[in-house]
A protein has these predicted regions:
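Bacterial Sec-dependent N-terminal signal peptides
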Residues: 1-24
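Compact alpha-helical subdomains of small soluble proteins
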Residues: 66-70, 74-168
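N-terminal Sec/ER secretory leader and immediately downstream segment
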Residues: 27-97
Length: 175
């Protein structure tokens, strides 16, 4: 009995090891995988919306009416802040923003490149949609991108320099 259990465990571990797909190692491999992913409407068994309106349809299916009412009652800033680490993370992971998906690819075309910015955009736009407000997409995108740049600049401003190199240029020999 012990031997059968041991063999079964090793067999399962061996199959699990082979079932894992290695991440791309080169830029060309990454681009190839990315180009395949952005054409798919389904990643890992999860439907990927094609655009923002399709994302709204999916969120309406997944979120209960009472939860939508709670979400609507919050201010936009409060909703975006409170849901960033729950709904926002769910969106990033399940809709394939890190590895690329057709939805993240469409957002890149709008000027959003960071996965967290994309999820923030969806949360804020969904809040506006539920509250029957104008989406004002270009202004919203501009605000999100500016906030990302400002945060990045502040982080870099106070960051210590780990190593500084000085390039010595050899003097030209005179003839």
């Amino acid at each position: 009995m012990y031997k059968i259990l041991l063999i079964t465990c090793f067999s399962i571990m061996a199959f699990a090891g082979f079932a894992q797909k290695e991440p791309p190692e080169t830029l060309d491999e990454y681009k190839k995988e990315y180009n395949e992913r952005i054409k798919k409407d389904n990643l890992a068994g999860i439907y990927i919306p094609k655009d923002l309106n399709d994302a709204f349809v999916e969120l309406n299916k997944k979120i209960a009416d009472k939860d939508k009412d709670k979400f609507k009652s919050l201010s936009e800033d409060e909703a975006a802040h409170k849901l960033f680490f729950s709904l926002g993370r769910w969106i990033v992971v399940n809709w394939g923003f890190d590895g690329g998906s057709r939805l993240s690819h469409s957002f890149k075309g709008l000027g959003l490149f960071h996965p967290e910015d994309m999820s923030t955009f969806i949360i804020r736009a969904y809040h506006r949609k539920l509250n029957n407000k104008d989406l004002a997409m270009s202004e919203l995108i501009k605000t999100i991108v500016t906030a990302r740049k400002t945060t990045r600049a502040a982080d870099l401003k106070d960051a210590p320099v780990l190593h500084e190199e000085v390039r010595k240029i050899p003097k030209k020999k005179s003839k």
